[in-house]
Amino acid sequence: IIVDGNKTSGIESIIRDLKKHTKITNVVSKAHGKMAWFETPTNLDLYKDIPTKIEGGFETQAGVFSSDGVDPASKLLAHFISQDLSGTGADLGGGWGYLSVKALETNSISELHFVEADLSALNVARNNINDQRVKFYWYDVLKWEAPKLLDFIIMNPPFHYLGRAM
């Protein structure tokens, strides 16, 4: 089986996850991509899109941004965002939901619109964010329109589209 992908699309975390389950024959890295191959296993059930638990009890999934743990920029933002947010807001490009969970630790947020273009990340975020105040949107943040005026926006850019930072 040959696995090929862009580094910005999460191929490195996918290959890292594969190494936990099978012996990788070889890995080739060129420009912004990587390719790995391995012998076809007898049982392919291990390779289904199954979320994994990380530090803090969060779930992530191979292929989504920062699937191995919370990235340093998000940790820094989380320290500040929960202090002054109130009213209705949005988490644009929320990934698997870390910043939203941290923001929702305050009771002064009445409603949070969680917008994510990556369906795998959105599905994992639904598992991580168990809060009635959140509405989930599978949408490109460049095209999403807020249903009403927002009091705040949470973002940790850049976002990636077709391998380019936006």
In which residue ranges do the predicted regions lie?
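A short, charged helix-loop
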Residues: 50-63
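Class I SAM-dependent methyltransferase core
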Residues: 91
